[in-house]
């Protein structure tokens, strides 16, 4: 089934609410809406994080040092296995997240 998703129109009822787009052989593709930070976490798989609308400050740890990068619409952040990170939206943001199904 084909889909067209206008990501800038998606709004969830709560921060980090998601629209499940598809699951491709155990890889989930979800569109998230948020206006609040997530929490520091480490995924048990790789994660691709694409800002579809808005701006997101991504904080992550590399070699024991906390680093920060400001992502704008169209920017992509890749978190490898074991990368501790947290996303802080700057106002409302819509983020496409691609990761292993049930990743934590």
Please provide the spans of the model-predicted regions.
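A cytosolic small-molecule/anion-sensing beta-strand core signal
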Residues: 25, 52-53, 72-73, 91
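Conserved short histidine dyad/triad with adjacent acidic residue
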Residues: 27-43
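Short acidic-glycine-tyrosine-enriched beta hairpin
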Residues: 63-81
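Ligand-binding loop in jelly-roll beta-barrel domains
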Residues: 81-104
């Amino acid at each position: 089934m084909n889909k067209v998703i206008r990501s800038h129109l998606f709004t969830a009822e709560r921060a980090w609410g998601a629209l499940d787009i598809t699951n491709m052989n155990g890889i989930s593709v979800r569109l998230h809406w948020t206006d609040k930070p997530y929490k520091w976490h480490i995924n048990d798989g790789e994660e691709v994080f694409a800002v579809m609308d808005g701006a997101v400050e991504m904080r992550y740890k590399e070699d024991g040092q906390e680093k920060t990068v400001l992502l704008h619409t169209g920017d992509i952040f890749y978190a490898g296995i074991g990368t501790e990170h947290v996303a802080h939206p700057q106002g409302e943001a819509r983020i496409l997240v691609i990761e292993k199904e049930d990743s934590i």
